Amino acid sequence: MKRLILFAMLVCTLPALACTNLIVSKGASADGSTFITYAADSHTRYGQLRYCPAADHPEGATLKLYNYGSLKFQIEIPQPAHTYQVVGFINEHQLAIGETTWGGISPLDKGNAEGIDYGNLIYVTLQRARNCREAIKVMHELVSTYGYADGGESFSLADPNEVWIFEITSKGSEKGAVWVARRVPDGYICGHANQARITTFPQMGKESYKSIDSRNLKYIDRPEVECVYASDVVKFAKQRGWYSGKDADFSFADTYNPLTFSGLRACEARVYAMFNRAADGMKRYEAYAMGDKNAERLPLWVKPNRKLGVQDVMALMRDHYEGTPMDMTQDVGAGPFHCPYRWRPMDFEVDGKKYVHERAISTQQTGFSFVAQCRGWLPSKLGGVIWFGVDDTYSTVYCPIYCGTTQIPVCFEEGNGSMSRYSETAAFWLFNRVANFCYLRYDVMIKDVQKVQKELEDAFVKEEVAHAERWAQEDNDRRLIGELNRFSNDRAERMMRRWRELDQMLLMKYIDGNIKHEKDGKIETTETGVVRFPQQPPYPAWFYRQIVDDKGEVLRVTE
């Protein structure tokens, strides 16, 4: 039996930057695409789309890296002879990367004193790798050479053929990192949400290349390779006194990010929510998701009960635990209008007992999110699409931006506004205006939002498929790039125009707690132009009961 030695270790709870990723293999998708999703949830993260053009670099050229969070100078590293174009989190070869942070155990959670942080590890890798396997090799080389200045992370990797989950943590005061990467089996989906998920994993055998360690990366392109890991991932834990069992029984997650109540309820529960809506038989993991460490553990991947299209994947990123005991629309915290959002802090105490609000996939503090779609049957510039949205996933619109795009739409452009500077032309601020207004009377207003959301996304998906088919045979690179720019920018402009109309309609329709009558997208008036008297639906009966229980003697009507 393996034995985990956990004394004198502090386990981090929910990280400040809490995100959600879904990973969909080629065989699990409806059209042979691969998908990864990423919701960048942070109270300080602004929604914008980074662009870095491809470039040739002279000998001796260097790259200065600034910390992804603090923007402080981190490290300067040599440039290779050539780097690839990157649009957000996907490059010109349809390699896409997402992440979620889990921190891990002390003293590894702070990372090396110097080195590359997780954000720059993503961006530098996208500039240097063409597929998932190259990405694993590049990431290992970067952290081994320059150090890893962050704690525990889970990365999602996708290219047109494969999807992988890659988990890593620093070695603390010792330079470098320990990590494990596993290929998601074809036909399956995987996910992670701020909790390490790879437990035991296949290790190197004498007559098999199914699993290789970092000393054997020369074999990484062999098709049978399905697991890759740092050669000292077990040895390092043993040297630190954190594990003393057999190498074959070693669990990466249990050693470097042991389960806690918050790791289950605030993190694993989000993966459960995705699996629960996509696969059969997930009820058995409900107790685990709700915080029972002794319950049956959620598997690393599951086989979905249907093939997933791009809109199915978008839908899986829109969830408040509806239909489960954790449904955020149903408890008293949702208020009379069933608002599934809770302001921070998440935890609270009453009469000496501790409680927690749920942490759902859809949350108010999302800076941006995306669905990255990779399609091997199309030219790379056209095949890779980052369906990009800002703010809350439940009320965002995913706009198609091609990986071959060279002109980012103004509404997503870097520098167009910030968390401390409002911009009328920034999608982030417009979508926040709409979402935050909806939180006032959520159950009614969100339906108006979803109607326009569906209108736009249905059109965008249909138009994108037709557009890709029409331009798949284009051999003039310059003409193709111009068309990609036009298509993506036109959709972004249409989205902004339609969302401004929605913003104005919501204000007119719902101002002051009223609900004005609407017909054919316009506020109804009488023949003389006077607005019809609005609807004023009462609060639900249970809410009136709470008012009476709390203040009934003061509010009671007397004769």
Residue ranges and their predicted role:
Residues 19-118, 138-307:
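A contiguous strand-loop segment
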Residues 1-4:
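Positively charged n-region of N-terminal signal peptides that target proteins for export
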Residues 13-17:
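N-terminal signal peptide c-region/cleavage motif recognized by signal peptidases
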Residues 330-472:
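Substrate-recognition/cap regions that form aromatic- and gly/pro-loop-enriched pockets
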Residues 257-353, 359-361, 447-450, 455-468, ...:
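Accessory, solvent-exposed terminal regions and/or long lumenal/extracellular loops of proteins
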Residues 453-559:
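Histidine-centered catalytic/metal-binding microenvironments
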Residues 122-128:
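Short, well-ordered beta-strand elements within core beta-sheets of diverse protein domains
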